[in-house]
């Protein structure tokens, strides 16, 4: 179920403070965060936010089409290595 509109988007306070201070200083430094649950707001446009995926920080450049999504959607936590093309061991004759 989506979040109620009367509540507004959720953004962690520490991340919001970093984004606002970066906007005031007009700096484009990478903002490092562990807050995957925070929603992307228009104030974050043009910034590169390094989102933690459980192992490392993945840089995410925020564009206009990402507004309204959560930061964790753009930093995948699982690596898919692919299926084996032709597995002769598991096949019965």
From Swiss-Prot:
It comes from the Bacteria. One of its GO terms (molecular function) is rRNA binding. This is Small ribosomal subunit protein uS19. Pfam families: Ribosomal_S19. Keywords: Ribonucleoprotein, Ribosomal protein, RNA-binding, rRNA-binding. GO terms for biological process: ribosomal small subunit assembly; translation. PROSITE patterns: RIBOSOMAL_S19. SUPFAM superfamilies: Ribosomal protein S19. Belongs to the universal ribosomal protein uS19 family. Protein S19 forms a complex with S13 that binds strongly to the 16S ribosomal RNA. HAMAP family: Ribosomal_uS19. The keyword RNA-binding applies. GO terms for cellular component: cytoplasm; small ribosomal subunit.
